[in-house]
Amino acid sequence: FENYIGILMGYRPEACDQCGICNIQNAVEADGSVYPCDFYVLDEYKLGNFNTDQLDTIDRKRIEIGFIERSKKLKKSCLSCPYFSICRGGCQRNRDLDMASGLYENYFCESYKMFFDACLPLMKEVAAAAQ
């Protein structure tokens, strides 16, 4: 809840899944393998290895696989949602691809709407009281 309160107060969320867009980070395994996120420690997302690759090579691979750019591809229904400013589409690991448009939507969307319908007014009160 503290990230939602912070968002309502104008702060950037600390939790990456509440940013809506992936940030540059590295998940590093014990063998030095580097991945763009701890939820994407999978062969197809491997960026390189700190034992054998330069950081600029690892960064180029991140751009090559389009990891951060993909997190920006949201359906118009998501972008126009009244809760988008606080939900931000969530983490890309929880998104389904619409093959026709090439855009994504969070598969918890309806649950988020139910949650915000019930809790957002109270969260706004807390945020206002904290300022």
Give the ranges of each region predicted by the language model:
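C-terminal accessory region of radical SAM enzymes
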Residues: 1-8, 39-82
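Surface-exposed beta-strand edges and their flanking turn/coil or helix-capping segments
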Residues: 12-13, 49-52, 61-62, 93-96, ...
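Radical SAM enzyme core and accessory elements
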Residues: 31-34, 42-45, 73-131
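A C-terminal junction/extension of Radical SAM enzymes
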Residues: 1-43, 86
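Residue-level marker of regulatory loop/turn positions in helix-turn-helix DNA-binding domains and
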Residues: 20, 70, 101
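Detector for Asparagine
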Residues: 3, 23-26, 49-51, 94, ...
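Short, surface-exposed, polar/charged, turn-prone segments marking secondary-structure boundaries
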Residues: 25-29, 54-57, 63-65, 108-109, ...
